[in-house]
């Protein structure tokens, strides 16, 4: 793997290609990456993908997995959190707990307007249907994340997305390009059982709200407890959408999304 075409790839060259050309160029590399363990994938990415390496985390139910995995290979990697101001109190305490336990290099980014200012100007966007939710996400998650990637001069962005989590993630590759940076998903093929065994093996905890019936945790106003008959996707954003926008390509300036 270390001697494959992967080690010769340059981000600037890939950005000059069309989306289809990018996918084809990365196809062989992704096939090889699928054969590696998650830790081997992370180490490969650190060695072969250029630019500052960062990892994003919402500090959700299974957040400890990705944070532990990546910091094993690079202890000081910047950990990006987009803080909306509407996270659960348990989430803020979980952030403090993991930051201390794993000695995280936490980098917190927030919207340019405070939550109170936004409500005064727009009302409660999360109650305004799909358009309101998308505007809310753009203001509080997408823009702060783009700013984080720019300010940290990120070239490679690690994320803990998994195919099992939703239909929108079912066909994601390990390596892609999103909005001008490498996007790397080392646990994309892991199951919930894989995650559980990893956390157990390394003495790591789930988010505390898991014990109260939450499968996924985001903001207080767009997260529901799981009830019989619900899918995980239906516990977020009133079931109107699964993605908050962070993991979607804007499709304007750059080619391949995920």
From Swiss-Prot:
It catalyses: [thioredoxin]-disulfide + sulfite + adenosine 3',5'-bisphosphate + 2 H(+) = [thioredoxin]-dithiol + 3'-phosphoadenylyl sulfate. Signal peptide: none annotated. GO terms for biological process: hydrogen sulfide biosynthetic process; sulfate assimilation, phosphoadenylyl sulfate reduction by phosphoadenylyl-sulfate reductase (thioredoxin). It is found in: Cytoplasm. InterPro entries: PAPS/APS_Rdtase, PAPS_reduct_dom, PAPS_reductase_CysH, Rossmann-like_a/b/a_fold. Pathway: Sulfur metabolism; hydrogen sulfide biosynthesis; sulfite from sulfate: step 3/3. It holds the Pfam family PAPS_reduct. Keywords: Cytoplasm, Oxidoreductase. GO terms for molecular function: phosphoadenylyl-sulfate reductase (thioredoxin) activity. Belongs to the PAPS reductase family. CysH subfamily. Catalyzes the formation of sulfite from phosphoadenosine 5'-phosphosulfate (PAPS) using thioredoxin as an electron donor. NCBIfam families: cysH, PAPS_reductase, PRK02090.1. HAMAP family: CysH. This is Phosphoadenosine 5'-phosphosulfate reductase. It comes from Vibrio atlanticus (strain LGP32) (Vibrio splendidus (strain Mel32)).
């Amino acid at each position: 793997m270390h001697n494959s075409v992967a080690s010769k790839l340059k981000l600037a060259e890939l950005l000059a290609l069309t989306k289809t050309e990018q996918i084809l160029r990365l196809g062989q590399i992704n096939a090889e990456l699928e054969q590696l363990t998650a830790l081997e994938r992370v180490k490969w990415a650190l060695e072969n993908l250029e630019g500052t390496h960062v990892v994003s985390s919402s500090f959700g139910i299974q957040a400890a997995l990705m944070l532990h995995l990546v910091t094993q290979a690079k202890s000081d990697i910047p950990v990006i959190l987009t803080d909306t101001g509407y996270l659960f109190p348990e989430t803020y305490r979980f952030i403090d707990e993991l930051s201390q336990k794993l000695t995280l290099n936490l980098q917190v980014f927030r919207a340019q307007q405070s939550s109170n200012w936004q409500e005064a100007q727009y009302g409660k966007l999360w109650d305004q249907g799909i358009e309101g939710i998308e505007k809310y996400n753009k203001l509080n998650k997408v823009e702060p994340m783009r700013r984080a990637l720019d300010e940290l001069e990120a070239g490679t962005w690690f994320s803990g997305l998994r195919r099992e989590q939703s239909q929108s993630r079912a066909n994601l590759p390990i390596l892609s390009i999103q909005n001008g940076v490498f996007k790397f998903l080392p646990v994309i093929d892991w199951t919930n059982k894989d995650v559980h065994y990893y956390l157990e093996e390394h003495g790591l905890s789930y988010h505390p709200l898991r014990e109260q019936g939450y499968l996924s945790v985001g903001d207080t106003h767009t997260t529901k407890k799981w009830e019989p008959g619900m899918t995980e996707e239906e516990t977020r954003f009133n079931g109107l959408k699964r993605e908050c926008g962070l993991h979607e390509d804007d499709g304007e300036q750059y080619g391949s999304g995920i």
